[in-house]
Every structure is written in structure tokens, then in C-alpha cells.
Amino acid sequence: MNKYETLFILNPSLDEEGINTNVEKFKSVITNGGGEVENVDLWGKRKLAYEIDKVNEGIYVLVNFQSDAQLPKELDRVFRISDSIIRHLIISLEK
């Protein structure tokens, strides 16, 4: 299994329940795909470097996980179709 790190930015209009629901949804994508979530770090609301879709701030969430090489592709697909995600990035921590 490879180690990965993903950072995603949620829409700032989400309330606490909406944030938790989205984080749990993405964690379940990882665990249902055979991965293992190691750490979830909620950075909170921060100002964006530039405006994205008429939004100046977002809620940053950092997740470290282990999985096989196919899971990041599925997670990327889920991020792309989610309306609550402003931006996302998935990187491999080791080869």
C-alpha cells in the first residue's frame, strides 16, 4: 500500500454539520476502496490566495491515508463531482 495526502477546500457556506458530513463521505470513499485513513486535520476557514468561483475563502481539510494505486483516481472522481469542493489535490508521499 502507498501513502497519500489529500488537501481539499470546502465551500465556506457549509455549516458544522455539512463540513462533518462531507469529511465523513470522503473518508468512507477511502475505507470502502480498501484504504486506511491515518489522519484528518481540519484547518478551518482560511482566505484563498485568489478568488475561485466568486468565493474568497474556504474550509481546508488535510487527510493522510494509505491505499493501493487505484483509489486516488476514484477519490479524484468523487471530488470532481462534489458541489461542496472548491479545489482538491492528491499527492503520493512515497514511491
From Swiss-Prot:
SUPFAM superfamilies: Ribosomal protein S6
Pfam families, per database record: Ribosomal_S6 (PF01250)
GO cellular component: cytoplasm; ribonucleoprotein complex; ribosome
Gene3D superfamilies per record: 3.30.70.60
GO molecular function: small ribosomal subunit rRNA binding; structural constituent of ribosome
GO biological process: translation
Listed PANTHER family: MITOCHONDRIAL 28S RIBOSOMAL PROTEIN S6, SMALL RIBOSOMAL SUBUNIT PROTEIN BS6M
NCBIfam families xrefs: S6 (TIGR00166)
Designated name of the protein: Small ribosomal subunit protein bS6
Organism in which the protein naturally occurs: Clostridium acetobutylicum (strain ATCC 824 / DSM 792 / JCM 1419 / IAM 19013 / LMG 5710 / NBRC 13948 / NRRL B-527 / VKM B-1787 / 2291 / W)
